[in-house]
């Protein structure tokens, strides 16, 4: 929550400004209405695919990972409903599979990484295997993830170690 406004003559009426937009209560916080018409969000990272039209994707603070078209040939421009949520949590990195843009790698807080298919809805989590029973992997809140520019099957992922997958994280 970044901002609160309390009506000076009616303390039951409060507006809450937060990472996802605004919440409005008229009963001192017992019930809230969230305005979903405001296109509000804070992206941590963004990426694009190579489709036509190309898509922008990225992780948003407290609002998961989203993907939408960069432009449209339809009158009225890009609509909010063109965007789709592909991963939950605090969204961070998102990157398309360079061989099949319907698959997107997505990461959320604490090193949670997975792959999501925008056509089928199929998803699965990816985690590097434990090195041994005594070594616990520690991930930064916003852990690193990258596609190898020379090998479409190789992705890198960071904890206190650099992890490398040569089979797209399978």
Place the predicted regions along the sequence by residue.
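Beta-propeller blade termini and top-face loops
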Residues: 1-170
């Amino acid at each position: 929550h970044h901002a609160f406004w309390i009506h000076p003559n009616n303390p039951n009426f409060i507006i809450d400004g937060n990472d996802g937009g605004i919440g409005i209560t008229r009963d001192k916080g017992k019930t809230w209405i969230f305005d979903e018409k405001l296109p509000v969000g804070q992206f941590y990272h963004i990426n694009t695919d190579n489709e036509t039209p190309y898509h922008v994707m990225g992780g948003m603070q407290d609002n998961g990972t989203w993907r939408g078209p960069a432009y449209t040939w339809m009158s009225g421009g890009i609509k909010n409903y063109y965007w789709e949520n592909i991963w939950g949590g605090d969204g961070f990195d998102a990157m398309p599979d360079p061989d099949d843009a319907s698959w997107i790698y997505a990461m959320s807080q604490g090193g949670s990484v997975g792959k999501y298919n925008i056509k089928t809805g199929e998803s699965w989590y990816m985690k590097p295997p434990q090195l041994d029973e005594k070594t616990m992997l520690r991930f930064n809140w916003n852990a690193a993830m990258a596609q190898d520019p020379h090998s479409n099957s190789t992705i890198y992922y960071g904890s206190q170690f650099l992890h490398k997958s040569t089979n797209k994280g399978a």
